[in-house]
């Protein structure tokens, strides 16, 4: 208490941007009404999502269903001077360029997708170094493209058809793959027989797991439910794609096991079946991440798999206009790479309800997150810790996004990221994880996005103790799970949804016992309690079966049991996998 006469004064504490300390408290932690300008309010996307997996035996309803997120791992191989090099130095058996993606790709992205989200990245996500691209303009190259037409439904190319063309040489900056070819289209039908089809059958270079990407054109009369089926070693998996958005880029469907060579068990089929009158379009289909293609002067390509390269080069491969990926006109790939991550997000999301003031591909991305590791060290071997970053004013000083949402929504997001991460890592690893700061500063990755965004400096790649944790797969899982939970919490709260369900932890004591007659195997398991998340309670289990050299199937629900019987045949090798979800199965509508 201050003495008189100062005890009658009201004291206000502000930061250097004039924001009061009360305003720095995230909405979710407030006991009052909060700042409504940081919430989406009536702004929401209620349409068909960009892509849906129709073969899953369950449907998410209390997670991130139909939410579109833009996520990326920090840096990658880039060209500077006259050499290709990493953007960050070698330290403790790695470099940041390699380290951050070892958390984002195998852990964070699957967690978000398992919760129902559609996740996109400005960098290649597939570790597969082989690649097969099948396209209508070169129907016999790297596989086979075949069309089947029906009466009243003939595949054609429009007069203004501009689409993908597989490059026959390395990619110079002047090569625009999605502006060099054509696409095909056909009228839709509501009947389910005698369908027109387009089939892409690749010549798979080597047996293994390949990401499958499709591309198409978005026309004024495109439909929101184009039907694709991926045939793979585990059977077939069906998808619907909303072709009203996202034309002329790569859309990730999933990663599947394929046998080397060409066969009907390895292909993608698109039909003209739809519940809507209009057209479906067909363009290139890509199998696998592949190797670097971008060439630089006398130095050739980077020589690394595409997933190790910077976003600047993938953006060109993914159809971004050269004015957005080549912003320095070939003079500074590093600066291009910093800008292109946000440029790609804004281009893809432009024209959607969340980015109504920019032209683009109308994909309703509503959140962006860049995951980095930081520099800095302590000589006493203590933890250096985590840092989050946001930007509450853009380059012109605007405090609101084009949608009308306050940029302080990003402040809330970055605050929740660092708060939750500190609490989760401290609890799980029984230490005091260091919460550094939540910066509101001018960084391209948080200044340029047209939707709420943050940078998370997860830990220091320069600090020995941090890296003892950073190389631990359990730590990577725990860190990614904390980020997933924060995104789940933040995205729902922004739309006024205060209840959500966290996906459960993996089961333990998973066992298999053969029956006496050898015709069945008894699977049993125990659920794992998550002391940090009361909603992460298993409600249903899905069993996946792999027979012989095939891949896992699409799964079968066994309800909320802790044991089940699986029928088997003699002289066959089986592999069985189990996942659980925290919501009971609901039929697809």
Residue ranges and their predicted role:
Residues 1-75, 80-85, 283-300, 304:
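Non-catalytic propeptide/linker segments at domain boundaries
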Residues 519-535:
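Conserved aromatic anchor
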Residues 233-262:
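Extracellular carbohydrate recognition and processing domains
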Residues 536-571:
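Recognizes extended acidic, P/S/T-rich segments that occur
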Residues 196-220:
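A short beta-strand element within beta-rich, extracytoplasmic domains
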Residues 72, 308-408, 439-462:
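Active-site microenvironments of hydrolase-like enzyme catalytic domains
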Residues 188, 267, 273, 284-290, ...:
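Active-site-adjacent mobile loop/cap segments within catalytic or ligand-binding domains
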Residues 579-589:
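Residue-level detector of conserved catalytic or cofactor/ligand-binding positions
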